[in-house]
Each structure stands twice: as C-alpha cells, then as structure tokens.
Amino acid sequence: MFERIGIVGAGAMGRGIAQLFASAGKQVWLHDARSASISEALRFNRELLERGVAKGRLSAAELDATLTRMQAAPALADLSGCDLVIEAIVENLEAKQALFIELESLLAEDTVLATNTSSLSVTRIAAACQHPERVAGFHFFNPVPLMKLVEVVRGERSDPQVIERLVKLAEEAGHFPAITPDTPGFLVNHAGRAYSTEAQRILAEGIADAEQIDRILRDGPGFRMGPFELFDLTGLDISHAVMESVYQQFYQDPRYTPSYQAAQRVAAGLLGRKTGQGYYRYENGQQIRTPEPQWRPIVVERPFWLDSQDAELRGRLAALLCGAGTQLETGEAPSERAICLITPLGEDASTMIARLDLPATRSIAFDLFADFDRRRVLMRQPALDPALEAQAQQALSHDGVPVEVINDSPGFVSQRVVASIVNLCCEIAQKGIADPQILDRAITLALGYPKGPLGFAEHYGAGRILAILEAMQGCYGGEARYRPSPWLRRRVRLCLPLTAPDRPVAG
C-alpha cells in the first residue's frame, strides 16, 4: 500500500490529485518549480473543501484532517520519503524524462514513479530511467475528485506488482482503475476519437453546420454536449493536437483522420471559450447560440408514400404523419403525386432512391435510427423539389417537435457518429487494449456519453450498426475509415454479444 505520496506539478491536475489522496487518508506532499503555485494550489483546495463543509458534504474535523495531510514540498528533495511520486507537469517528453532522472537520484529504489501523461508514451518516459520497471502511467481526468476514473498504464517494462499497487490505490480513493497497455491515446482518448473526428467530417462535407450537428446529437442519441460545444469548452487547439497525435501514432490509419478545417481554425485563433469565439460566440463567458430557424406554416397538399424497410418503425412514422392529418398511400409503388419518405440505414438518400427506382424530385429521407420525440431529421438530396421538402417538414413538425433538414449523407448524422463510436471501440477490443466491459464503463465515466459502446450496440442493435458501416463504406467507395471491425463483424455473424471474448493467444 502507498501511504506517502509526492506530487510534482501544482496545476489543476496536480492539486486535484493532491486533494483526492489527502481526502482518502494519504499523506501528500505537493511540489512545483514555482513556490507560488504550491501556495495557490493549497489555498484553492482549502477553499474547495470549506465549501464542502458549508454544504454538509464533510465535517469540520474531516476538513482539518484532510488539510493537515496536504503539505508543501518547496524542494524536490522534500519528496525523498515518499513511496509514490506522481508527476503532473507540462506535456513534454524531454521535461518528464529529465524530472524522472532527477527523482531517481533522490528517491529510494522501491519508490514508484507514475506519470499523469495523457498522450505521451509511458515506455519512452521510462526509457530514461535506470529502473524503468518502477514507472507506470496513472492518468486522471479533470476535475480529479469528481471524475471517478483513472487509467493505469502498463509500460513495456512496468513491473506487474506496480500496476497492482496503483490499482489498489485508485480503488481506495474511490476511483475506477482501467488498466490499459501503453498505446496511443491509452483508452479514453483513443475511444473518444470517433465522436470528434466523425463530427468534423460531417461538417467538412457540408452536410450540416456545427450547431445543427450539436442539436441532433444532443436530442437524438442523447449526448450531454454536442461535439462542437465540447471543442469550444476544451479548446480546439488542445483537441486538434490530440487528434493529430493519435493519427500520427497510428501511422495515418484513416479511422483517426483529423480535420483540415480544424487546423485552419486553430491557426485563426478560433479556439472556443478561452478566446471568445470558436464554433459559437461567447460574451462574458456565456455561449451565444444562433436562434433556430422558424418555418412559415404551409398547407400539406400531397400524400405520403413510405418505404417498408422496418415494419415497426414504419408504423411509428405512419402514426406521426396521420397525426398531422396527411394522407398515406399503401401501394407497393408511389403515385405520381406522392412525396416518397424513405428511411435509409447507412446509405445516402441518392443511393437508396436509385436502388428503389423512386422519383428523385419527390423523394426525401427521414432518420428513424435515433429517438425522434425531441428532434427529427430530414435529409434532402440535390434533385428534390424545395416545395415538397417544405411540405415534408411541415407534416413532421405538426406537434411542435423541431425538424432539422440536412444535406445528403451516408448515415445521416446520428447513425454515422454512433456507428463510428461502436466500431472504434470494437477495434480497441480486437487489439486487446481493453476488455469491452471495462471500456464501456471507462467511456461513460470519462466522456459522459449517455451509453457506452456496448450500451449503444445493445440499444440500437449490433446488426444495425454493422449494416450502417457496410453501407457507409460502400457509399464512400470502400474507404478504409468505415471498415467494420472484425470484432464486430464476427460477433454479429455468429449471433454473439459484443462482450464475447477471444481466447488468449498461446505462448
């Protein structure tokens, strides 16, 4: 067990780690190259804990005991009695290596060295040490006391006992330890690439604007924040750097391709909240959203003809249209007056219209994939008559639920984003980076998704996810970005749950 913990770096991460372990009963010493930063961090933690007392979350006695356990370490040598030292300094390989070299000269040989790096190789940091076996990754998420996850990263030469001890320490502090090998992005930053890069791809293709994409993903699949809100909150410079880093570390695998538009916005200083403008504008720190378009009511004169890919979902859509008082056609083919409402899964509208030999001027797509009680999505295609688009929008918004109209896209917005998340996480499982159930819990804890990838697959159906990916890949001419993971494909083909494990490789 670890009882004396040193922390190097008194920024947001370092002070959060200090508070976490002091609250868990550990003696903590906090060091920073700037002595003023240590004082600021300890004062910040004291004020935060005092607010906890005021709200009844801890007693005055617990406050005093916790503060007593957090001590300043003005000199690095003051950490010499620690049995664990966690670095939380600048994200720079040479700086971290230099720190660990100096720490090795001051600490006992059995003291464990942990790095809080979010993107650098733990193995490369440890390579500078005389005893790389005592080095491991211990990656927390900000704010540390509230984000109940820590990635415990095995470097190539990390001692298994070091990993076990860090796991136990995390559990003592009430955090979920996700053990992961030393791979690009570790676990969470790796899995999170699907949400961010797919949203950027949708924007770059002119399918929808940033605010539309955010609204669709909040109100359909139920994400707490849209991807572009998240870019603005995190800072696009930081997010784009992570996207580029993961892409390069995986040797330009198309799954991780970042956005050239994001690079341009970074160069222009459109970074989000911290610069007052990103994908949204900010005044006094408050986001300014563009008002949603208000459509003039019109008379729906045309009947609707629905495709019949899914009988249950078709019934829900028919009931919605009947509620608007529209006429529905039930024939196998549409009449010459009917608006054809199609429901592609993974295909774009143009492909499905051509496949079904439907009249392009009268055909528009509706997304039945995600819940549509809060927001609905129509997808136009280049040949559509705008007057008929307006009638479709009127009919589907009669009950006050807003309707987004986007341009033609394989998989709309929700389908392609959710399918990309599930697919990437299946690939992570295939590579042995994490067990699917561990991955599921880690993602919901760290990223705040409404469901983990397994939850998404269970809710929407793994078979439907595979169908979306296969159709998208076909629409994009076989593009490798959308290739289905073997993990997903095999389990769907064999009717197995995505949690079904592979057997360990012998040897």
Short names for language-model regions:
Residues 37-40, 51-113, 120, 322, ...:
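Rossmann-like NAD(P)-binding element
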Residues 14-15:
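N-terminal Rossmann-fold NAD(P) dinucleotide-binding loop
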Residues 24-26, 175-182, 210-409, 416-420, ...:
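NAD(P)-dependent Rossmann-like dehydrogenase/reductase catalytic/cofactor-binding core
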Residues 30-33:
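Conserved acidic E/D residue at the C-terminus of a beta-strand in Rossmann-like folds
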Residues 21:
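Aromatic pocket-lining residues of Rossmann-like dinucleotide-binding sites
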Residues 10-11:
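Glycine-rich Rossmann-fold phosphate-binding loop(s) that bind the pyrophosphate
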